[in-house]
């Protein structure tokens, strides 16, 4: 029976590349986004054309009841989630003192609250099955912090701490929890950079360029395939930048 992989925030960018990478292996794929329904359906068509079965679920994974409905659909069609990839995330650029509380809540709820929600529903079956993989997409800003991205940095620091703590809790049940701390990746999240700003950033990165979404997807798949002894790790993927 094929394993089931859930990737949140997967209509574009890193999540999209991860979904396509797992689809190559003919896994059951569950893709999700908050409102880009058309993009999600296009991705579903690509995945099914590759021979993989797919559920496309449009909904806000920062909402607990929405995630509950998503897992009901998954359970009906595929059964339990074997691989949970928590990729949904948002950022906001600006001074901390100008950040409104509603925007703080939105960033925290999306970037860390969604992980609570999805883990809450995925973990019981993983424990029952004595196997499972949870991979959280984090950021180097969760390690060192970024000026003018305080809320995002705080949320990703929480992702890293959750990853390490949950890995210890679930290791006795043969469930591995790891995170990828991404550096500058060439996705829409960084599209606000001007050409001059992007060039200056590339000069700061020892590798001389931003990473690609496909490279992140390749690393995520390698983590999934890695020995079960690899758990609780925050793996930097930043071209030697930080």
Predicted segments with their positions:
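Alpha-helical segment proximal to the catalytic Tyr-Lys
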Residues: 124, 168-172
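Short, small/polar-rich loop/turn modules that mediate ligand/substrate recognition or access, typified
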Residues: 171, 176, 230-232
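Active-site helix of classical SDR
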Residues: 119, 155
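Residue(s) in the substrate-gating loop at a strand-loop-helix junction
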Residues: 139
């Amino acid at each position: 029976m094929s394993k089931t992989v859930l990737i949140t925030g997967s209509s574009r960018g890193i999540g999209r590349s991860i979904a396509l990478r797992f689809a190559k292996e003919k896994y059951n794929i569950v893709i999700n986004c908050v409102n880009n329904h058309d993009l999600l359906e296009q991705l579903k068509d690509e995945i099914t054309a590759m021979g993989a079965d797919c559920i496309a679920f449009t909904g806000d994974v920062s909402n607990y009841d929405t995630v509950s409905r998503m897992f009901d659909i998954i359970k009906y069609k595929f059964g339990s989630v074997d691989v949970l990839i928590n990729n949904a995330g948002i950022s906001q650029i600006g001074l901390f003192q100008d950040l409104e509380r509603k925007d703080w809540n939105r960033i925290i709820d999306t970037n860390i609250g969604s992980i609570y929600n999805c883990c809450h529903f995925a973990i019981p079956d993983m424990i029952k099955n004595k196997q499972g993989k949870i991979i959280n997409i984090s950021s180097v800003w969760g390690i060192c912090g970024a000026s003018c991205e305080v809320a995002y940095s705080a949320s990703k620091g929480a992702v890293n701490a959750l990853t390490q703590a949950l890995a210890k809790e679930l290791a006795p049940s043969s469930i591995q929890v790891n995170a990828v701390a991404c550096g500058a990746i060439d996705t829409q999240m960084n599209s606000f950079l001007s050409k001059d700003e992007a060039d200056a950033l590339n000069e700061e990165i020892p590798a001389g360029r931003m990473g690609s979404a496909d490279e992140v997807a390749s690393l995520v798949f390698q983590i999934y395939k890695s020995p079960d002894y690899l758990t609780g790790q925050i793996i930097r993927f930043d071209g030697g930048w930080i």
